[in-house]
Amino acid sequence: MSAATKTMGLRNFVMAASLLLCGCLGAPRGVDPITNFDARRYMGDWFAIMRIENSFERGLTNVSATYSIRPDGYVGVVNRGFDRAKCRWRSIEGRASFQGAPNIASLSVSFFWPFAGGYHVIALDHEHYRWAMVAGPTRGYLWILAREARLDQQTIDTLMEKARELKFPIEELVSVDHSAIDCRTEI
């Protein structure tokens, strides 16, 4: 195989990978991120109340995310959860940037460069920033978040109804356990 053929093959691979990555950033069709978003008010700690189970959070309890404005202008992201089977915390740090105007809650989040995924706030307590519903790039990713580890059932029901209307598989939503952590083994 000639050097030119190898270079062309590599270039095609990189272009194909880039197209695939770009396809993972937008919101699902028919799902719009909220507008009038205030990133500074969104910063801080959020607890996962419900989620559609996914490979990177499977088995984790006490899941939370912390967002902060970094000096370089990116949004710092720290996701954390407790692995009760191994009795240890797992966390990962990343960064996010707005996909467009900062008043539209559509961001791309990267934990491993150059890979990024979409993060779209699709419902929000605009008055107090007390709860939010976040979608990923497909309907297979959905979270209900709150500033505290509990959220009233009426708000959860309202958010689940909105998710159902947007054709998310709400039957796949699971509650996130935020009970006290105790790893003592019985003797």
Language model features: what each stretch is:
Residues 2-14:
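Bacterial N-terminal signal peptides that target proteins for export
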Residues 12-22:
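Bacterial N-terminal signal peptides
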Residues 24-187:
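A beta-rich soluble binding module of mature secreted/lumenal proteins
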